[in-house]
Amino acid sequence: MAGSGAWKRLKSMLRKDDAPLFLNDTSAFDFSDEVGDEGLSRFNKLRVVVADDGSEAPERPANGAHSALQADDDSLLDQDLPLTNSQLSLKADPCDNCSKQRELLKQRKVKTRLTIAAVLYLLFMIGELVGGYIANSLAIMTDALHMLTDLSAIILTLLALWLSSKSPTKRFTFGFHRLEVLSAMISVLLVYILMGFLLYEAVQRTIHMKYEINGDIMLITAAIGVAVNVIMGFLLNQSGHHHAHSHSLPSNSPTTGPRCGHNQGQDSLAVRAAFVHALGDLVQSVGVLIAAYIIRFKPEYRIADPICTYVFSLLVAFTTFRIIWDTVVIILEGVPSHLNVDYIKEALMKIEDVHSVEDLNIWSLTSGKPTAIVHIQLIPGSSSKWEEVQSKAKHLLLNTFGMYKCTIQLQSYRQEVNRTCANCQSSSS
């Protein structure tokens, strides 16, 4: 076998020709790796030269193929010929397909990062709860509670990515996006119940001061917490991205670019948000470490433990308030904070042949999936252009303002006639 392979490579080398390879765009080649004829040479790279001047072509093509030179016939582009199924499949928009493939690849990378982060958070959160219980430290357990909020946020992000691939059903025609909102409400409620219990214990310790804390275990647990959060920061850090601490757009700026509201930015934003949460956990872990150091070497200052519980409980309440507010807005079908209804109406009015925008309703199926229903009236006499107007309005809502879905109703403008209701006439008489 080895001798046969060496003989094939030798024959291939002897067949090489230094003449430049000339091909036209109609030449056919077999790129199959399994060539039946051993006499044919194999190649992994191919250089194609396209020229208008036929004199540049060598008399014998270097690869043994007999290519026929043909002039470009642009008239074929003007002919309206029916396309076969195979041709239709080639006519698919490659940019759209490529963007979907890139989106799937991004989601896989994001899911991998967030899954690793969730596992680390879960393991260390359990370790902190056990260490805090053994050390009798409320500060350690409050830090674990804050870590629970970050773990919930990551799980909700993974849930949203998973639900985005699920198709709607006959009963749930919008899909299962609101399940993310329901999960957020349950997780925040659980966090508040645990926080209330820890605050109650902290108040009891502050009043009675009858407790002992194992400073060694508290110090070791706090030091491990700092190390874990540093690892989380490196894991979630995205080189080349600017890590902003604001997760919302200003209300007077309805958009920041094309398709700003779609999910191709959601992956980086999800990891970025988790990175910011990891920074917050790092600061809190450093605070617990300082308190543990004080209690370890100055046991009489054990009041630092309930004080840390108060401070960190406020931090947990502050970080979860935004989740509660966003959840309430979604449930009440309010307009997302980064969209401006008046600005969108003005943009729709600038479309040619649009007379007025009668109704515009905007809400969110879930976080990052705004939806719109709009009723547009056309200028009288422009009914024949309704497809063009609808296409422009749809492009504006989906691509410019980042709507996840939109429904557009069009009708010709009709001047309202002042008509008096028959009941009103009878009552007035």
Curated annotation (Swiss-Prot):
Topology feature Cytoplasmic, residues: 1-113, 165-178, 238-274, 332-429
Claim: Hydrolase is one of the keywords in the record: no
Main location: membrane
Gene3D superfamilies: Cation efflux protein transmembrane domain (1.20.1510.10)
Keywords: Antiport, Endosome, Ion transport, Lysosome, Membrane, Metal-binding, Transmembrane, Transmembrane helix, Transport, Zinc, Zinc transport
CC annotations in GO: endosome membrane; late endosome; late endosome membrane; lysosomal membrane; plasma membrane
Short name of any one Pfam family annotated for the protein: Cation_efflux
Region feature (Zinc binding): 240-264
SUPFAM superfamilies given in the database record: Cation efflux protein cytoplasmic domain-like (SSF160240), Cation efflux protein transmembrane domain-like (SSF161111)
InterPro entries assigned: Cation_efflux, Cation_efflux_CTD_sf, Cation_efflux_TMD_sf, CDF/SLC30A
Binding site for Zn(2+): H146, D150, H277, D281
Subunit structure as annotated in this protein's UniProt entry: Homodimerization could regulate efficiency for zinc transport. Interacts with TMEM163.
NCBIfam families reported for this sequence: CDF
Family: Belongs to the cation diffusion facilitator (CDF) transporter (TC 2.A.4) family. SLC30A subfamily.
Name listed for the protein in its UniProt record: Probable proton-coupled zinc antiporter SLC30A4
Biological source species: Bos taurus (Bovine)
Gene: SLC30A4
